[in-house]
């Protein structure tokens, strides 16, 4: 991975079609903060944080590793994350990218940093459940949540590569994604790891893939709970202990089973609600969920 300083702005970087260097980026950030549109304000505030003299930005965790809290993310680590994504997805300077997520959260922030560091041509639009309805352009790369993808299936082929994160992809959406030309990836990560550190290819595979593969310079282990422990020295100073129970295939590959917080211990047999819900989805129409209730003999039992 190339060593690139966090003050670097790629010569090919564009925002909404305009060439942007560091000085212009400051001017744009101030203009966005003064703008009346909330999504532009959040972009502007983040850019000002990125361009200040500190070597870190502050962010709020999602709760993947515990109670949500404010943490400091090193700017150099964010650059390293951007380079790893570019390497994994083979993104190139002048590739067209779309920001359709709020810049308040790590996924939106990192779309901006990837564009600055990799020299992408970034379009910024208002976050919406149907983002591609707000633009007629074609793109090489975009990050979405599954809800946005599910409401954009007709237009999604206008994007070559899409990463989905922030929530799991249900079986119905995954089946529909098999028929489109877009390369779709399910991403795994959190604020503490500066967005994703592993990917699962959702479509265009010979056989269905249910395992996540590590990005460059990332390895995995498990703790005594069988929860994933992430060692990603280029983006996190210390190993990140998650509450996600996994089947560890190797030091660079795992299958996600469910959250430790949600385990149902029924007579010593551990039930993972998320896994059960995925398996019965094709048999049940409508909304449902698996939960637990007390049982005199089993201790707990799973309830639909």
Tell me the role of every PLM-derived stretch.
Residues 152-205:
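Gly/Ser/Thr-rich phosphate-binding loop
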